């Protein structure tokens, strides 16, 4: 659970292909629910600390983080937490499971197909799905 950690850190590289609105959504969430937070562009100069939850959007950052956790003998899901952006099959298996937050691809695909078939243009907010696993 997020409440057992002292701070949430979003790792969001400036060169990410993900929309910048993710950062503002993260900040809004943390402020709304009174979480301490920090946005970092890279893990290169960031020390991994007990009591932190890291949200990674890029797979490279997830791997760097997992390697540091292993090298520093930290207990994932107890001393430190991870939430990774976008569900993939490997995340079910890594370290007994990495928690994920993903866009609802089924709804996204269905809505996109409806728009193509009806020759419409529309803008909508697609829902997200959170899957809690051992990393949190």
Where are these regions (language model features)?
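Bacterial carbohydrate/catabolite-sensing allosteric modules
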Residues: 1-136
């Amino acid at each position: 659970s997020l409440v057992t950690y002292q701070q949430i850190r979003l790792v969001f590289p400036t060169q990410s292909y993900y929309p910048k609105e993710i950062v503002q959504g993260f900040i809004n969430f943390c402020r709304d629910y009174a979480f301490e937070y920090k946005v970092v562009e890279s893990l290169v100069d960031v020390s991994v600390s007990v009591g932190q939850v890291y949200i990674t959007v890029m797979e490279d950052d997830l791997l760097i983080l997992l390697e540091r956790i292993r090298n520093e003998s930290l207990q994932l899901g107890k001393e430190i937490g991870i939430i990774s952006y976008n569900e993939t099959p490997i995340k079910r298996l890594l370290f007994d499971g990495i928690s994920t937050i993903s866009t609802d691809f089924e709804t996204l695909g269905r809505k996109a197909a409806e728009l193509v078939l009806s020759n419409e243009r529309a803008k909508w907010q697609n829902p997200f799905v959170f899957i809690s696993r051992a990393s949190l």
